[in-house]
């Protein structure tokens, strides 16, 4: 919950409400879950959830945690499956590299530019840019960072900004409370 235009929600709580005599919302309702009963037929009481109309519908989500990194481009509210990138390189690998001092070359580095032959014989080259050039400006305008590995100092300003041409305006949303949210709920928050 929050106000339109805010970079992050002002409050995060489960979407559950219970009413024995008083109204309970969020975590308080969750804690009383065993003693709550719904005294209404759900099919007779519709619920309306709204999304602020001016929220961005285009951008890139970079989620990098302990074992895997995902980049997911979203355009006009739709995920672009052909451009999703999964990289089995994340925080655990960076920690191992820094503590052991190993040379850090991966197959992912060698595969940034690669040619593929299609069944019809046509050869295409796929580079690190997987989204149409016409939408890249829109994608760079809304980048959401998530996961513990994005907490490294300077990752937003230095690393993400370096990926865009200097003429493109970049907006990076990296809420400082993302670590506390993970510490509080852990991976269980995505497995509810």
UniProtKB/Swiss-Prot annotation:
This is Actin, muscle. The keyword Nucleotide-binding applies. GO terms for cellular component: cytoplasm; cytoskeleton. One of its GO terms (molecular function) is ATP binding. Its EC number is 3.6.4.-. The lineage of its organism: Eukaryota, Metazoa, Ecdysozoa, Arthropoda, Crustacea. The keyword Protein transport does not apply. It is found in: Cytoplasm, Cytoskeleton. It comes from Chionoecetes opilio (Atlantic snow crab). Gene3D superfamilies: 3.30.420.40. Actins are highly conserved proteins that are involved in various types of cell motility and are ubiquitously expressed in all eukaryotic cells. Belongs to the actin family. It is an enzyme of class 3 (hydrolase). It catalyses: ATP + H2O = ADP + phosphate + H(+). Keywords: Allergen, ATP-binding, Cytoplasm, Cytoskeleton, Hydrolase, Nucleotide-binding.
